[in-house]
Amino acid sequence: IQEDDANANITDGDRWNDIGDYEIGQTVPYKYTSNVPDINGYDTYYYAWHDVMSDALTFNKNSVKIEISGTVDGKAKTYTLSNTEFAVKEKPGNGDTFMIAVADLKAIVDREFDAVDNRKENTYGQTVTVTYNATLNDKAAENTGRPGFENDVRLEFSNDADSEGEGKTGYTPWD
């Protein structure tokens, strides 16, 4: 969550923190970062974020933005995925509020960050950043004095190179 006002306890210069102080009706921004693993053994690579928001938060589907940052020929580059390169599904099941899925992260990274190492394999490790917003709604007033409204996210990813990205997936722990 990005804190909406300066706070000496937040050491991150852009005010990103695990908690925030918002009022009903305000937009609450979220940001998650991860790194592209070595996916040379895959033909395709599935990558998805699963999010479970409190009922006091209303997800803004149109606010989703995904960027991949890395280097090309020694120069910094950030690529923003188009809306056709990922899908947002609300209430996909399993208690998730929504899911953001990139069907083939490998194809995008290989196209936009085409560096290879001395073995002629693609170089990975780029940073993937997903941002989106929610609005603190009137349900927040139903339980005043509580410590806050939880928002949990986990990453789902291909984890079987032999299945061509269509098979088994793994998950990170909820955070």
State the predicted function of each range.
Residues 1-41, 50, 150-155, 159-175:
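Serine/threonine-rich, low-complexity linker/repeat segments that form flexible spacers/stalks
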Residues 18-21, 70-139:
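Extracellular adhesion/glycan-binding regions together with long Ser/Thr-
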Residues 25-29, 44-46, 61-63, 95-97, ...:
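Extracellular structured ligand-interaction cores
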Residues 32, 45, 112-173:
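Serine/threonine-enriched low-complexity regions used as flexible
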Residues 33-70:
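Low-complexity, serine/threonine/proline/glycine-rich extracellular segments that form mucin-like
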Residues 51, 82-84, 101-112, 149, ...:
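Extracytoplasmic/secretory soluble proteins
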Residues 68-72, 157-159:
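Short acidic, glycine-rich loop/turn motifs
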